[in-house]
């Protein structure tokens, strides 16, 4: 009996560590870091890369974490209590606001669309999660995992590389992460799968090169026929 209790505690601790390591807040920053290390963007000036990484870090990790922490302390909520559906709105709104400011800052810096698209796709995912949260609950962790996999497919079309090994790695990570969220009883299987699907679809639609072409064509067609 004691062995089972120890095993259960170890499993829960492991699940908590996995959830903490693969937090949705870190995904945009890590995506930019990977782009600057493994793609042709590594040839860009170091100062430019540091500025972009600094902006992304401030608005997607530092500001959301800080504002949610302050909100939690003011209201006396524990991290576990914020998992409840009705208490998730304010953290979502705080994070969405921070991402909007990040997009505005990146626009002022004239950062290319395929970089701002990472933030835009994350923003779209969060807005959908807020809307769905009115009646149901999606896993933001799995939405982030789905967005990463969708981004890999989209960027493979843009940068012409074979994403198979990267896809294998991140699909495995997504499976482990989804299992961890279920073990912690933060989400059901349906919420995990729903979050993954939302992240995957949004990321593909926003980041795929074909989407950028369509976004450019529609204003031109509208201008021609007006």
Question: What spans do the regions from the language model cover?
Answer:
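Short, Lys/Arg-rich, polar N-terminal cytosolic tail immediately upstream
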Residues: 1-15
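Juxtamembrane helix-capping/reentrant segments at transmembrane boundaries
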Residues: 18, 78-94
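The first (N-terminal) embedded transmembrane alpha-helix
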Residues: 18-39
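Membrane-interface helix termini and inter-helical loops of multi-pass transporters
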Residues: 39-48, 77-80, 108-110, 211-224
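Loop-to-helix transition at the N-terminal end of transmembrane alpha-helices
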Residues: 45-61, 85-86
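Membrane-embedded catalytic cores of phosphoryl/pyrophosphoryl-handling enzymes
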Residues: 112-226
